[in-house]
């Protein structure tokens, strides 16, 4: 309570002083009661009666001896949370979050560097796409790309066991800012520590509180008038010299005042004090209140005497003050008379320490023996001191103790005090009391007393009387008990020293105490014992009369004497006793001192409760610790997954007859004597404790198959497999049933007499034929299932099905074979001893036992071999250097981590060496229609390329336009009928000449299909169609034969049955190249031949035929009208070639027939002559999208292009809309591609087809390197034949597209692959009945007449046998499209399973199919090879002037081409691209390239490498940094050392690796090491560099944006990167890069792009004090916004780093 102050507010309160005294005394009791037990109501007090009075506590005794060390207490309760600290610094990178969802497809990367300029070719118009070339050789393996950025850390592992304490780290003094940055959060209160060993005796404690007031001394004589003193305590005297630093004072009582700081929290007095917290921020001014009185410091030097103050009001007696210095004795005053014994004065409570010295206390306990001090000399008498310091108000004088007042009344219970009240006014001085009893022991004195003045020899004083026992105090009233629910608090702080107790009974005289320690000189004591005889004093004042006078009145108290002068320092006193521990002091603010020596080891504490798992620390991983002791056995883990069954063990064998146990199972075995009999098996032991997880076992043998489980649910259908190759041809099917009698046919012209054929057996009756007007029947039943086909190619793996439902448990499997012996279990507890059994006979060798159940894990085994290196952990903050640990055990392989986030686009790699020619890339997307180019120069004809892979099957074409009807021929002469002619079928006659064009006749009745006619010669090439034909079957690819002679179009023959497979023809010789001819006019279409709807098997691959000569130009013939009815003849011999018939009359238009079957493919014509150059055509239709390319490699990011020149709006002339054909049938699926024919003659311009819908885009091809150029390349060589393409899937037919604009005439395309025969079309409607013919006599063979009108259907003849294979007929012209007929009647399916026939011969090339609708784009096929070069197009118009590209690499030397014809002079071309940088006289610029990997970088194209080395960033010597410009050659040291320099002093002495100097190097992307790396381990972390000789200076340009900046005009790019500005490391030293230097543009971005190497230690490491500074992205509004603070985590950093490009001037 002596720390509570009251300040009287003025005179009105003085009257309440007595009441305040009592009240405060009671309050003190209630307050002090706060430390009592409060966990029961009323703190355990009996509140039923009145308040019990507790006697006042006596003075504190001497400290007892140090007790024995106590036991470890239990862990303390968790303390209350400490105050909220200031906001911490930015934390390190957090633990990676869970893998996010897959991000959207990122933006397309920047374009790669432009390649080197090629040698300009002759400008020519691009030919059509050539055939694909063969695959090129695989390229050489490129240089390794730059190391990717470090992957994000894995998920935090489980906390490992507590490692041993690491070695003490190196001290590092942080600056104040760094201390603030790295200051940790206040820790939790620690556990109670062990009792330490007794410490050394501490320094003498501070002066204790004052004792009770002693009796007042006799008044001294008035001293001489002092010099004017300061006015009371209110004014300050002259500043004294700085005193010695006092010891820290004890802590004040905790206050309940809430201090409002930056963070608002209430300070509770009962909280444990935590460790020293961080330095708080500047608080706002607190509540103004007077603080506690500090402990009096060491005395200052003596001040000047103050002026006399006015007499103050008599103040209340203050508490005893600190003893002042020993003043000199004043002049002796007149002797007073002895006063009467006064009554004992009352105990006075004063809130202030008393200044009066108490009476001598009881002897203290035996103190420790100190060194005997030297005896001091008697001091001189001092002069009278100045008035002592007043206590309380300025003008009050110190009063004497008052008498004990009467007992006051009980006051009202006061409300609990929240704040300290003001001090009360000083009371008036009471009358002097009698000497009090002995006070409590005085405080320990200071170590060094002040030397007193030499004193005068005093007289012996009388012995004091024993004091009487004090009177008993009054019993107080019972206190109010507040019996509310009281929560037990923590132990309170030690209470203040209590008031002095009432005088007790006189004790016995104590033993002589040891001499006390020297204390600070006190006030003058009572008269001492007789001293040593002093020197004679001066003559005294005349004494009183010897006569007895009346007793004088007690004199007034004398004025306090003037302060004496400061005496000399006294002899050091003995050490005082240890004081009690002080209250915790306030947090100090000194700088953290160096670590002290290690203390003695404490007693091991009890195991604390496990703390919560803390968050992962942020230090760098510490070194690998020593191997720890085996940990306690953990709780049993969950049962592991059953391992695979082991292989059967070898059977054990017990040989009791030999006395030896064979080591079958391995290990040392005991000897069994002959006649041994094993005892019965003991009961199983108790399970042993589980062992640690064993190492991963070797893979066991596969177990036996278990019982089949229930069938799972059907999975989702897989992707359709590729179509298989055609099966072998089936057996010939049975002959069809005989048809019904048909309508009579028209009499044909008599044929030549045929050779007699063998008589065929009569055929069965056929199915009724079609009757005019009959409706088609319903669809027949489905046929029987065919034989299983051959196994198809495996389909693509389907998507995984859903997980099936849990199957029913299977039946118990068969008993498995015994497995390997299980691991040894823990030894079981001993079972009870069995009874002694009889000895058994030796057993036979038993069968192999079943495997034992796996034993529980054993105890920790011996130390294993070092495990595999673990996965590198995330980079933490630097940890303290730990003890070097043993290698830990190998951990089990973890589960694969979740997929990481999609990384940012990596930095472009270093340009590798030019690789070998790679495989051709896939076609890119169809580009937009370009502008019409200028006419180019004719290119030189390229060499013949290889044949390409056949393309995919085309989509069905639309039906062609019906041709005009041909002329009617003249009637032939009657045939000469010879005997036997009607019995013999004649052979087919020769082909007649082409008839004249007839008029259009009426459409005849649909006749029955005739027997197959002889194939005609191939017709001339038709005009190229714009629309794809019907997708034909894929034949076996043959090598393309040379085109045959063109035949004239014969009349349509009847399609024969499929022929047998022909043998492969011989390979023809290639024809000579024709001269350039003019484009011939388009030939007429021939008649379309009928086909029998039996599809032929795919033919074998034929050899390449001889090149045919160009066919004659045919007339545009049509189907002739029916001739006059000839005499009926039998089939005659082949007649001579007839002359052309007369032109027939025009017939009526026939009915539209159904779409006929697809004709056989025609032969491939020879290439026509090259036409003259035409004028530029109108723009062509957009091509179909190309097939999907394989994924290209990621190109280097390109530079941002310049804005292109504005294009010319040029639309072609609108074309005529083409007719919309009927929708064709869906073609059969292609199996193998046919051979590519030679190009046909150039056809006339076809009518444009309808525009198909846009196909789905193919996959993205390789990004092309497209330097702008307006010069077309020359046509390439003809490629070699391609390999067979795989069959694509059939795409569904698409809807008809809108009418397209007319396209320009395209270049002549290559002939398409030969198609298979189409499917049989529907039977057309029957034509009108013809006139009946008369039977004629057999005539001689006349000339072949034109085909007559269809006659009536004749009676059905017998079905003839299959005739021999006829000769190949001519190719017919495309027929007119028929109208859709009504469906035919369904055939009766034969119920026989037909074997597939053998592979038939390759059919002839069919006619162009009808125009089908454009189907949707099928799935992308495999990439094709390079096509043959197209013809040179006409010269294009001059292109727009292009931006100069960059210089590319020089291509390889081309082959010598043939001498081309002289082309027409072209228009002047645009300026060419800049050439290679030439060697100049002034060459000698240096360029440094840093790879930021451990691979040497390549110099840019055209530059020589001068040397390569290691990328030096800067040095640090004598704590100063010396920076290197990364763009200059000095940053590329040829050799690496952690200490590449030494230092020399002026004394001609140099030192190497003797200081803490450092070197800093650009680093690689190698994973951050846990510990500093040394020697060879350093190499993967140091970036390599090359110094190149450049023809011009290189500069860096920075975009201050995320986009790549452009090089200035006339400069080319060398590399792109990130804008590196500066760096700092140890000691806040560092450097920076000039932003114009290439060193400021690093190709790769890292948060820490360099590593620190310590020269003295020879190690390198990434320490936490490295900072890199980069230019950031700045929005365009430069002055319109204030930068906003932001923290970027990993993954977002590159979005705020400026990009840059290093450019070199083109010379």
UniProtKB/Swiss-Prot annotation:
* UniProt key word Repeat: yes
Biased composition annotated in UniProt, kind: Low complexity: 74-84, 203-213, 524-539, 669-684, 716-725, 732-744, 784-794, 826-839, 1262-1275, 1322-1338, 1374-1389
What does the record say about domains?
Alpha chains of type IV collagen have a non-collagenous domain (NC1) at their C-terminus, frequent interruptions of the G-X-Y repeats in the long central triple-helical domain (which may cause flexibility in the triple helix), and a short N-terminal triple-helical 7S domain.
Q: How is it modified after translation?
A: Prolines at the third position of the tripeptide repeating unit (G-X-Y) are hydroxylated in some or all of the chains.
Where is the organism placed in the taxonomic lineage, from the top? Answer: Eukaryota, Metazoa, Chordata, Craniata, Vertebrata
| GO terms under cellular component | basement membrane; collagen type IV trimer; collagen-containing extracellular matrix; extracellular region; extracellular space
Tell me which domain of life the UniProt entry assigns to the organism this sequence originates from: Eukaryota
Where, per the database record, does this protein carry 3'-bromotyrosine? 1485
- The Collagen IV NC1 domain is annotated at 1484-1707
UniProt function note: Type IV collagen is the major structural component of glomerular basement membranes (GBM), forming a 'chicken-wire' meshwork together with laminins, proteoglycans and entactin/nidogen. Canstatin, a cleavage product corresponding to the collagen alpha 2(IV) NC1 domain, possesses both anti-angiogenic and anti-tumor cell activity. It inhibits proliferation and migration of endothelial cells, reduces mitochondrial membrane potential, and induces apoptosis. Specifically induces Fas-dependent apoptosis and activates procaspase-8 and -9 activity. Ligand for alphavbeta3 and alphavbeta5 integrins.
Question: Which gene specifies this protein's sequence?
Answer: Col4a2
Spans of biased composition, class Basic and acidic residues?
175-186, 270-279, 565-577
**Residue ranges under compositional bias (Gly residues)?**
121-130, 148-157, 852-861
For the biological process aspect of GO, one term held by this record is:
negative regulation of angiogenesis
- Protein name as catalogued: Collagen alpha-2(IV) chain
Its localization reads: Secreted, Extracellular space, Extracellular matrix, Basement membrane
Example GO molecular function: extracellular matrix structural constituent
On whether Repeat is a keyword of this UniProt record, the answer is: yes
- Could you say which residues form the signal peptide? 1-25
Instruction: Provide the glycosylation site positions.
Output: 138, 1270
């Amino acid at each position: 309570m002596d720390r509570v102050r009251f300040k009287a507010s003025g005179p009105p309160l003085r009257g309440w002083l007595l009441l305040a005294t009592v009240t405060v005394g009671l309050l003190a009791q209630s307050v002090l009661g706060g430390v009592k037990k409060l966990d029961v109501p009323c703190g355990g007090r009996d509140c039923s009666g009145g308040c019990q009075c507790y006697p006042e506590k006596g003075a504190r005794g001497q400290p007892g001896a140090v007790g024995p060390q106590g036991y470890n207490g239990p862990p303390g309760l968790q303390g209350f949370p400490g105050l909220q600290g200031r906001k911490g610094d930015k934390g390190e990178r957090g633990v990676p979050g869970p893998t996010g969802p897959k991000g959207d497809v990122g933006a397309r990367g920047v374009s790669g560097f432009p390649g080197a300029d090629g040698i300009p070719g002759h400008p020519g118009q691009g030919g059509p796409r050539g055939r694909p070339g063969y695959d090129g050789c695989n390229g050489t393996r490129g240089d390794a790309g730059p190391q990717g950025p470090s992957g994000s850390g894995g998920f935090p592992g489980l906390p490992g066991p507590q490692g041993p304490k690491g070695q003490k780290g190196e001290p590092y003094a942080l600056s104040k800012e760094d201390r603030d940055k790295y200051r940790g959060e206040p820790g939790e209160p620690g556990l109670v520590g062990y009792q330490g060993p007794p410490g050394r005796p501490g320094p003498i404690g501070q002066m204790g509180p004052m004792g009770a007031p002693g009796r007042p001394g006799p008044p001294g004589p008035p001293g001489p008038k002092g010099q004017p003193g300061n006015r009371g305590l209110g004014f300050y005297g002259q500043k004294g010299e700085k005193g010695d630093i006092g010891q820290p004072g004890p802590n004040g009582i905790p206050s309940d005042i809430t201090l409002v700081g930056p963070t608002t929290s209430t300070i509770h007095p009962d909280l444990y004090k935590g460790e020293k917290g961080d330095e708080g921020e500047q608080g706002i001014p607190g509540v103004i209140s007077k603080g506690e009185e500090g402990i009096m410091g060491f005395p200052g030097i003596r001040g000047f005497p103050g002026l006399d103050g006015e007499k103050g009001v008599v103040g209340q007696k203050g508490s005893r003050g600190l003893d002042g210095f020993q003043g000199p004795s004043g002049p002796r005053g007149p002797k007073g008379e002895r006063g009467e014994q006064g009554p004992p004065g009352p105990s006075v409570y004063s809130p202030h320490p008393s200044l009066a010295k108490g009476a001598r206390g009881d002897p203290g306990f035996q103190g420790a023996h100190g060194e005997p001090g030297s005896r001091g000399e008697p001091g001189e008498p001092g002069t009278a001191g100045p008035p002592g310091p007043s206590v309380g108000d300025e003008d009050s004088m110190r009063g004497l103790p008052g008498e004990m007042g009467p007992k006051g009344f009980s006051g009202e219970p006061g409300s609990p005090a929240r704040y300290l009240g003001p001090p009360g006014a000083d009371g008036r001085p009471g009358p002097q009391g009698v000497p009090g009893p002995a006070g409590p022991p005085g405080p320990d004195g200071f170590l060094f007393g002040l030397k007193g003045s030499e004193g005068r020899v005093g007289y012996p004083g009388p012995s004091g009387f024993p004091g009487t026992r004090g009177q008993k105090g009054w019993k107080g009233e019972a206190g109010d008990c507040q019996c509310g629910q009281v929560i037990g608090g923590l132990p309170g702080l030690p209470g203040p020293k209590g008031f002095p107790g009432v005088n007790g009974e006189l004790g016995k005289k104590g033993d002589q105490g040891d001499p006390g320690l020297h204390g600070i000189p006190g006030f003058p004591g009572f008269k001492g014992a007789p001293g040593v005889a002093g020197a004679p004093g001066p003559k005294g004042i005349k004494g009183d009369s010897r006569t007895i006078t009346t007793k004088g009145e007690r004199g007034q108290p004398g004025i306090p004497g003037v302060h004496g002068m400061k005496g000399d320092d006294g002899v050091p006193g003995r050490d005082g006793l240890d004081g009690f521990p002080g209250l915790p002091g306030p947090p100090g603010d000194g700088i953290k001192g160096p670590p002290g020596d290690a203390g003695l080891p404490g007693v091991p504490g009890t195991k604390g409760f496990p703390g919560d798992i803390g968050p992962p620390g942020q230090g760098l991983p510490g070194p690998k610790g020593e191997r720890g002791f085996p940990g306690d056995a953990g709780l049993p883990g969950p049962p592991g997954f059953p391992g695979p069954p082991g292989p059967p063990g070898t059977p054990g064998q017990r040989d009791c007859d030999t006395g030896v146990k064979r080591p079958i199972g391995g290990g040392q075995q005991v000897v069994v004597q002959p006649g041994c009999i094993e005892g019965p098996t003991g009961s199983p032991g108790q399970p042993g404790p589980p062992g640690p997880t064993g190492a991963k076992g070797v893979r066991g043998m596969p177990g036996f198959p278990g019982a089949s489980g229930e069938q799972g649910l059907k999975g989702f259908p897989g992707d359709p497999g590729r179509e298989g190759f055609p099966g072998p041809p089936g057996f010939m099917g049975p002959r069809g049933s005989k048809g019904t009698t048909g309508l009579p046919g028209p009499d044909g012209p008599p044929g030549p007499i045929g050779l007699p054929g063998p008589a065929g057996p009569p055929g069965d009756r056929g199915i009724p034929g079609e009757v005019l007007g009959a409706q088609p029947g319903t669809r027949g039943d489905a046929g029987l299932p065919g034989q299983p086909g051959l196994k198809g190619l495996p389909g693509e793996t389907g998507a995984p099905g859903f997980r099936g439902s849990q199957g029913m448990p299977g039946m118990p499997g068969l008993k498995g074979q015994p497995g390997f012996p299980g691991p040894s279990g823990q030894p079981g507890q001993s079972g009870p001893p069995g009874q002694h059994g009889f000895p058994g006979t030796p057993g036979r060798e038993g069968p192999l036992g079943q495997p034992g159940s796996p034993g529980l894990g054993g105890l920790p085994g011996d130390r294993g071999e070092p495990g595999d290196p673990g996965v590198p952990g995330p980079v933490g903050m630097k940890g303290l250097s730990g003890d070097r640990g043993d290698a830990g055990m190998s951990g089990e392989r973890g589960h694969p981590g979740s997929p990481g986030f999609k990384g940012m686009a990596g930095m472009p790699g270093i340009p590798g060496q030019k690789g070998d020619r790679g495989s051709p890339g896939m076609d890119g997307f169809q580009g937009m229609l370009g502008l019409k180019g200028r006419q180019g120069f004719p290119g030189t004809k390229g060499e013949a390329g290889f044949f390409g892979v056949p393309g995919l099957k085309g989509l069905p074409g639309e039906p062609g336009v019906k041709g005009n009807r041909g002329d009617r021929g003249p009637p032939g002469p009657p045939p000469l009928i010879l005997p036997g002619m009607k019995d013999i079928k004649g052979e087919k006659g020769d082909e007649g000449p082409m008839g004249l064009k007839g008029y259009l006749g009426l459409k005849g009745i649909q006749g029955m299909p005739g027997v197959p006619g002889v194939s005609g010669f191939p017709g001339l090439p038709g005009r190229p169609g714009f629309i794809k034909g019907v997708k034909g079957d894929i034949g076996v690819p043959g090598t393309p034969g040379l085109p045959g002679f063109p035949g004239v179009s014969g009349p349509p023959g009847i399609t024969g049955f499929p022929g047998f497979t022909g043998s492969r023809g011989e390979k023809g010789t290639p024809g000579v190249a024709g001269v350039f001819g003019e484009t011939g006019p388009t030939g007429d279409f021939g008649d379309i031949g009928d086909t029998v709807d039996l599809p032929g098997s795919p033919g074998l691959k034929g050899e390449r035929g001889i090149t045919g000569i160009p066919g004659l130009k045919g007339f545009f013939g049509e189907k002739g009208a029916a001739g006059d009815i000839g005499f009926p003849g039998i089939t005659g011999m082949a007649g001579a070639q007839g002359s052309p018939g007369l032109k027939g009359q025009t017939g009526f238009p026939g009915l539209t027939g159904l779409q006929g079957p697809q004709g056989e493919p025609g032969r491939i014509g020879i290439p026509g002559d090259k036409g003259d150059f035409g004028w530029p055509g109108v723009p062509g239709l957009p091509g179909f999208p190309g097939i999907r390319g394989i994924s290209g490699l990621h190109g280097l990011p390109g530079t941002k292009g310049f804005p292109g020149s504005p294009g010319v709006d040029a639309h072609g002339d609108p074309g005529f809309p083409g007719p919309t054909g009927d929708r064709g049938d869906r073609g059969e699926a292609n199996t193998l591609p046919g051979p590519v024919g030679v190009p046909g003659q150039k056809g006339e311009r076809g009518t444009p087809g309808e525009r198909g819908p846009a196909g789905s885009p193919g996959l993205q091809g390789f990004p092309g390197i497209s330097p702008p150029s307006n010069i077309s390349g020359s046509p390439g060589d003809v490629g070699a034949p391609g390999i067979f393409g795989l069959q694509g899937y059939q795409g569904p037919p698409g809807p008809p597209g809108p009418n397209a604009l007319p396209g320009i005439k395209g270049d002549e395309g290559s002939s398409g692959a030969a198609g298979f025969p189409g499917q049989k079309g529907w039977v057309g409607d029957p034509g009108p009945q013809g006139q009946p013919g008369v039977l004629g006599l057999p005539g001689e063979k006349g000339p072949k007449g034109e085909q007559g009108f269809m006659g009536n259907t004749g009676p059905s003849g017998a079905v003839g046998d299959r005739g021999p294979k006829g000769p190949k007929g001519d190719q017919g012209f495309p027929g007119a499209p028929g109208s859709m007929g009504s469906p035919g009647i369904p055939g009766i399916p034969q119920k026989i399973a037909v074997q597939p026939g053998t592979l038939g011969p390759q059919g002839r090339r069919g006619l162009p199919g009808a125009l089908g609708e454009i189907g949707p784009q099928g799935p992308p096929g495999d990439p094709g090879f390079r096509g043959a070069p197209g013809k040179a197009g006409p010269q294009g118009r001059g292109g727009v002037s292009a931006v100069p590209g960059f210089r590319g690499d020089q291509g390889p030397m081309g082959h010598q081409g043939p001498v081309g014809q002289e082309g027409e002079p072209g228009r002047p071309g645009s300026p060419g691209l800049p050439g290679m940088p030439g060697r100049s006289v002034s060459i000698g610029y240096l360029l440094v390239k840093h790879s930021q990997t451990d691979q040497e970088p390549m110099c840019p194209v055209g530059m020589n490498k001068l040397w390569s080395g290691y990328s030096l960033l800067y040095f640090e010597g004598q704590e100063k940094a010396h920076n290197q410009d990364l763009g200059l050659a000095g940053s590329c040291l040829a050799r690496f050392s952690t200490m590449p320099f030494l230092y020399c002093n002026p004394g001609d002495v140099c030192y190497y690796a003797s200081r803490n100097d450092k070197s800093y190097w650009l680093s690689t992307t190698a994973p951050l090491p846990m510990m500093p790396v040394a020697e060879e381990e350093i190499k993967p972390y140091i970036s390599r560099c090359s110094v190149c000789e450049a023809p011009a200076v290189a500069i860096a340009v920075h975009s201050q944006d995320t986009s790549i900046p452009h090089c200035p005009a006339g400069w080319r790019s060398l590399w792109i990167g990130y804008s590196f500005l500066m760096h700092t490391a140890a000691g806040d030293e560092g450097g920076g890069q000039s932003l114009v230097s290439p060193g400021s543009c690093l190709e790769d971005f890292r948060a820490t792009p360099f590593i620190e190497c310590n020269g003295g230690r020879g190690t390198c490491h990434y320490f936490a004090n490295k900072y890199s500074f980069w230019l950031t992205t700045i929005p365009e509004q430069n002055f319109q916004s204030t930068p906003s603070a932001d923290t970027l985590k990993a993954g977002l950093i590159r979005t705020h780093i400026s990009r840059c490009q290093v450019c070199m001037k083109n010379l």
